[in-house]
Amino acid sequence: MPSSDTSRPCKRCKTENAPFSLRQDPTCGDCYVQYVAGKMNKRLGALHKDIRVSRLPTHRRYLAGLSFGPSSSVLAQLLDETAYRHSIKKSSSPFEPIIVHVDTDLSSQGGESPARKLLDEYRQRFPHATFECVPLTDVLSVKSIDWSTLPLDAGTPDEDPAARLRRLFDALPTVTSRADILRQLVRHLLLHMALERPCSALLLGHSTTALAALTLSEVANGRGFAVPLSVADGMTTVCKYETTPDGAVQETSRLEFPVYYPLREIFRNEMLQYIDLMPSLKEVVPSNEADATANVVSHKDMSIEEVMARYFQSVEDGYSGIVANVVRTTGKLDRSQGNSFCGSCGMSLDAEGDSRWAGEIGDDSGHGSGSGGLGRLCYGCKRSIHG
């Protein structure tokens, strides 16, 4: 953010009249930009070190999610810049970022969607990355979800897939449930695309602030056991399911795939300041996304995830250390991998923990589909899907 005292020199390069404040230090615009880019490059370097299997230069193809929000837009711009730097260095290994936006609009409007039009602007401004827009309906072909655990009807071959997903969301009990399941479906679809390409890793553009909000919303939703798996960098288990001839669903395979958050060490307000310093980003990031915290609304019709996001966005200026500590503490927790995984969110099942969460609700039989398939769901997904 702009500093109240512009007469002090930049803490990093000693340039006079540093107009910005970065981690309480006076900073010039160039150093501000370098700081944000350096944080992402550091995380990408750690990722490459974690997953490389040879000392020889290897092709790095990363798939990154794009929501059109500030953080994911900054990630797209920085990946485009990194791809350009690698392209002009003959000795550098190929670097190929694939930026994917999942269009969650399930309306039946014809013509080109607003998301595709906006993505065209991203393509023009960031030509060194590949941009794709995929409809949320593509998730219906994803095998990493046990669809028998969700209230999704069988449908007919010629039925509109969007209509089936609309009925699924209409069957969910609360706003929080719909936001929770939507986030899961988007994550499953991005993982599916990253595996199909194939890519080296899936990159998600969460800031420190967003990860803190995700941490507490996951705990509030009943997935405290799996928070280290869903928030920390590292390998995630992807299970594949198939329906047998007799109608039962069984797991057919599982593999490990890296999911990383390259912007995890940058606060949301720092992203917004970075966007103001980058004309290519300022022109393309929707202003309503950048000013999302300006509107004060009732929490009555908001999901837990939205409430947590607004809370951390409102306190990060005065209590940035607390926000960062939430994320750092989560990163230090053990990533305990279980033998069983939730058929909906894909996180490890903790039988004892689920029992403690459930309290007097009682045990489920764990057989059948729909409400009868509760045994394949973690406690958080049981509550999201069935109330």
Across the structure, where does each feature detected by a protein language model lie?
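Glycine-rich, flexible loop segments associated with nucleotide phosphate handling
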Residues: 92-97, 253-258, 301-304, 369-377
